[in-house]
C-alpha cells in the first residue's frame, strides 16, 4: 500500500517519466494551474527554484515562459505560503489576503509610509510601470540608499501585498510594477470568496496536486475558522465518495483521491534531480511520513554544521527519494560541479541508478547553461560500491 501511495503522490505532482503536461509555454501554464502555485526563490547556486520546479515537469521548458505568461495575464505573482507564481484564474482567492493587509492585520506588511505610497501610485498612474530603482533620483542622492532598503522598498511591498500594484514582469529577478487594474485580464472574477469557497479552493488544490494527505498536511499553516471550515469540506468529500480514508500502520489516517486509487500505477518514474523548494518536498512532514526521507535544506545552516552540503538537491529514483546531491553551476566556464553525493541504503540496482544519474546530470547541466559536468565525486562513490 505504501508503494502505491508514493506513486499516487508522485503522479499527482506530475513527476512521472512521461510528463502529463504539454511542451513549452502551454505546458508551463498547465503545470502551474495543476500544482496551484510555484514558489519563487532567489538562490542561484544552480538555476532558481521556480525554473527548476517547472523544468522537472514540463518538456522543452524555457526560462522565458514565466515572464511571457505574466505578460499574457495567464499567471500572476503573489503570496501562497511564500512568494509564488499563481494561476490568474485563481486571482480572486488572493483577495482575502490583500484585504487583510489593507486593514493592517498583517504582522509583516503594515509599515508602509502612506505619503510615499500615494506618491508612488500617482507616478505609476501618470508614467506607467516602474521599478524600485526608478524612484526620484533626488531622493536617492539626498537620502543615500533609503529607497532600496528602507521606506521605498516597504512602500512598494505594502502596495503590492494589499493589491494596489502587481508585478507585470521581471528583468532577471528585478521586479517591474504596474497598477493592478492594468495587469488583470478583462472580465476576471473579482468577487471576494466566502470562507467556505476559500476552504474548498485550498482543499481542491491539495487533492489535485498531491492525491494523498493527512489532516495535518491539509491544514498546514491554516488557523481558526478556516481550519474548521476545511474540516467541513473534508467530511463532505468523504461522504460524496471523492476521498477515501485509509488507516496507516503507524496509526495515521491518510485521505486519498478515490480516482487515483483506481488508476494504473505501473508508471516508470526514472530519475530526477529536484529543487529543495519543489512542491512535492516543501512540506517536510509529508516526506517523513510517506517517503521516510528526512530532508533539510542546509544553506541556512552554519558551514561547520552542514552534513550534506550548502544546496543539496533531493534525488528521486523510481518512486523513492534515494539521495542528495550538492551541485554548483560555474556559469562563466560553463561547468556544473558535483560537490557531494550522499545516497540512502534503499537504492536498488545501483548500476542502473548511476546510468540514470549520469543522463540526468547532463540534462541538468544544459538546463544550467553548462556544457560540461565535473562528476569526479560521483565516479569516486560509484567505484566504492
Predicted regions and their residues:
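Long, charged, low-complexity, helical-prone intrinsically disordered regions
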Residues: 1-385
Amino acid at each position: 500500500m505504501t508503494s502505491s501511495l508514493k506513486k499516487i503522490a508522485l503522479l499527482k505532482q506530475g513527476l512521472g517519466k512521461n510528463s502529463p503536461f504539454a511542451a513549452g509555454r502551454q505546458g508551463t501554464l498547465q503545470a502551474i494551474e495543476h500544482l496551484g502555485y510555484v514558489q519563487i526563490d532567489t538562490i542561484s547556486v544552480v538555476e532558481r527554484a521556480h525554473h527548476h520546479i517547472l523544468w522537472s515537469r514540463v518538456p522543452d521548458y524555457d526560462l522565458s515562459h514565466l515572464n511571457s505568461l505574466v505578460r499574457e495575464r495567464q499567471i500572476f505573482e503573489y503570496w501562497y505560503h511564500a512568494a509564488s507564481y499563481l494561476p490568474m484564474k485563481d486571482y480572486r482567492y488572493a483577495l482575502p489576503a490583500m484585504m487583510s493587509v489593507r486593514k493592517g492585520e498583517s504582522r509583516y506588511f503594515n509599515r508602509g509610509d502612506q505619503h510615499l505610497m500615494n506618491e508612488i501610485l500617482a507616478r505609476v498612474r501618470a508614467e506607467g510601470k516602474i521599478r524600485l530603482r526608478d524612484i526620484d533620483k533626488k531622493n536617492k542622492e539626498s537620502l543615500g540608499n533609503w529607497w532600496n532598503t528602507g521606506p521605498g522598498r516597504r512602500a512598494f511591498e505594502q502596495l503590492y501585498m494589499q493589491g494596489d500594484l502587481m508585478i507585470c514582469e521581471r528583468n532577471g529577478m528585478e521586479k517591474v510594477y504596474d497598477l493592478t487594474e492594468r495587469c488583470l485580464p478583462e472580465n476576471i472574477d473579482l468577487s471576494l470568496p466566502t470562507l467556505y469557497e476559500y476552504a474548498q479552493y485550498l482543499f481542491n488544490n491539495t487533492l489535485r496536486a498531491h492525491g494523498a494527505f493527512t489532516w495535518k498536511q491539509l491544514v498546514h499553516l491554516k488557523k481558526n475558522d478556516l481550519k474548521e471550515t476545511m474540516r467541513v469540506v473534508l467530511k463532505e468529500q468523504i461522504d460524496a465518495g471523492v476521498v477515501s480514508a485509509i488507516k496507516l500502520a503507524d496509526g495515521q489516517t491518510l485521505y486519498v483521491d478515490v480516482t487515483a486509487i483506481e488508476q494504473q500505477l505501473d508508471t516508470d518514474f526514472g530519475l530526477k534531480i529536484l529543487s529543495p523548494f519543489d512542491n512535492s518536498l516543501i512540506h517536510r512532514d509529508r516526506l517523513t511520513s510517506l517517503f521516510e526521507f528526512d530532508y533539510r535544506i542546509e544553506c541556512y545552516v552554519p558551514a561547520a554544521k552542514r552534513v550534506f552540503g550548502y544546496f543539496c538537491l533531493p534525488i528521486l529514483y523510481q518512486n523513492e527519494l534515494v539521495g542528495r546531491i550538492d551541485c554548483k553551476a560555474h556559469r562563466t566556464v560553463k561547468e556544473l560541479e558535483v560537490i557531494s553525493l550522499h545516497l540512502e541504503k534503499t537504492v536498488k540496482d545501483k548500476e542502473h541508478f548511476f546510468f540514470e544519474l549520469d543522463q540526468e546530470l547532463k540534462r541538468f547541466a544544459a538546463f544550467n547553461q553548462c556544457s560540461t559536468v565535473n562528476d569526479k565525486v560521483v565516479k569516486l562513490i560509484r567505484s566504492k560500491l
